[in-house]
Design a protein with these regions (language model features):
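Domain-level signature for soluble enzymes in the chorismate/prephenate branch of the shikimate pathway
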Residues: 1-271
Length: 271
């Protein structure tokens, strides 16, 4: 079964694919960017895709929040992957030779203190494993990549330093894309987008509909609507399945305080 992800072989997103679906029957299919993952699922090229949505250090992956608004897809699962960044070079490069670091912006941010300590320049790229591929194919001197040990092994590159992240407790949460969300399990989570009316107390009252039904919100994120200045869409995760009566009632109740609502999906709770 083909599953789309963003990045090259050895990327953390590929690890998330294997962790969620297992390694025996899955065929990870790499995409250049996140939009391509959504598009591949939308068109039926693949049945599912896996995208990162938040990191425990650097926070939200905003582009994917925006893509959930654009695409009419569902979330059918979530998975957390522990990131263990290593510093990777061509075999002939020594540590003292390094001047520039290639990696995805999120990984660069997660290793910010280590990079600044050594006064290295940074070169943001589209992917962690892709950075390893770039410095190998171009045989870049004085250059290292931040990626996984798996990426170093896949491209036969040298690991020159380990434990380089600012915080060893470094996890990324991934969501699994589909055309349908998951059936209730009794321990679920639902993701929802809504835009509160521009009136006093609208957001407060909308969120109160969950509290009054004893529904726990596990995350709330705001993003600009990009259509009206200073107007925001709110992305919320809450415990429960959308088919549960208390959840259905809460979703219906917030509509009187919102200009629109969109259920992204209900899925088994992992985090």
């Amino acid at each position: 079964m083909k599953i789309a992800y963003q990045g090259e072989a050895g990327a953390y997103s590929e690890m998330a694919v294997y962790k969620f679906f297992g390694s025996k029957t899955v065929e990870p299919t790499h995409c250049k960017d996140f939009k391509d993952v959504f598009e591949s699922v939308k068109t039926g090229t693949v049945p599912n895709g896996v995208v990162p949505i938040e990191n425990s250090i650097e926070g939200s992956v905003n582009q994917n929040y925006d893509l959930f608004l654009t695409y009419d897809l569902k979330v059918c699962g979530e998975i957390a992957v522990k990131l263990a960044h290593v510093l990777i070079t061509n075999p002939q490069t020594n540590f003292e030779d390094i001047k520039t670091i290639y990696s995805h912006p999120q990984a660069l941010g997660q290793c910010r203190n280590y990079i600044e300590k050594h006064k290295w320049e940074i070169n943001p790229t589209y992917d962690t494993a892709g950075s390893v591929k770039i410095i190998k194919e171009k045989q870049l001197p004085n250059t290292a990549a931040i990626a996984s040990e798996k990426a170093a092994n896949l491209y036969n590159m040298k690991i020159i330093a380990r434990d380089i992240a600012d915080n060893p407790t470094n996890y990324t949460r991934f969501l699994v894309l589909s055309h349908e969300d998951a059936a209730p399990t009794g321990d679920d989570k639902t993701s929802l987008i809504f835009s509160a009316k521009h009136a006093p107390g609208s957001l407060y009252k909308a969120l109160g509909e969950f509290a009054s039904r004893n529904i726990n919100l596990t995350r709330i994120e705001s993003r600009p609507t990009k259509t009206t200045a200073w107007q925001y869409n709110f992305y919320i995760d809450f415990e429960g399945h959308r088919t549960e009566k208390r959840c259905t009632d809460a979703i219906q109740a917030i509509e009187k305080y919102a200009t629109f609502t969109k259920i992204i999906g209900s899925y088994p709770r992992v985090i």
